[in-house]
Amino acid sequence: VANVAQISDAVEITESDIYLSFLPFSHTFERTVAHYAALAHGASMAFARSVQHIENDLADVQPTIMCTVPRVLERLYQKQQLELAKGSEVEQHRSQWAAEAGWRRFCRDNGLPIEPSAREALDETVLPVLDEDVGRKVRGLFGGRMKAILCGGASLNQSVARYFCAMGVPLRQVYGLTETS
């Protein structure tokens, strides 16, 4: 019960939320958030067919909340980067600029220090356009309606976390001891 209350303090869960569950039921983190917290707040739960089908399930279900492990996010990141590498030089440049400007926005929004950049003065002008073009596609990998992705089980690669946060993916790294749950 205490863990459900703590989750509720971190993520607002409502009856309109859809939780996508794909981690094993034996995973305490998954069970606490996906099952107990979702049920406590009347949220809907969808069960992924398997981790191998997670991309299709994200698109089909369009969840608002999910728990994951770093490997799943790293796989989605790698796939996105491979697709980007196939694009034109202009598309690659736009994506890089979107990541840089998005990271500065994330830092500003969260009170973190901002790395100096000559492009910083243009952020307010170009970020809405870049976000619509690039960020929306990245958020679309997660179904396009995600309000919280909780990643635990191991530490997430900093480059992956930074990229998704820069693209407006609502990602949170979480930590907890299974034996205290």
Show which residues each predicted segment covers:
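AMP-binding (ANL) adenylation modules
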Residues: 23-27, 176-179
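Glycine- and other small-residue-rich loops at beta-strand/loop junctions that grip anionic moieties
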Residues: 23, 127, 149, 153
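Phosphate/pyrophosphate-binding loop motifs in nucleotide- or prenyl diphosphate-using proteins
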Residues: 138
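Residue-level signal for pocket-adjacent positions within structured domains
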Residues: 8, 18-20, 40, 151, ...
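Conserved A3 ("GATE") glycine/threonine-rich loop of ANL adenylate-forming enzymes
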Residues: 71, 115-116, 147, 152-160, ...
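Conserved AMP-binding/adenylation subdomain of ANL enzymes
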Residues: 2-18, 25-135, 145
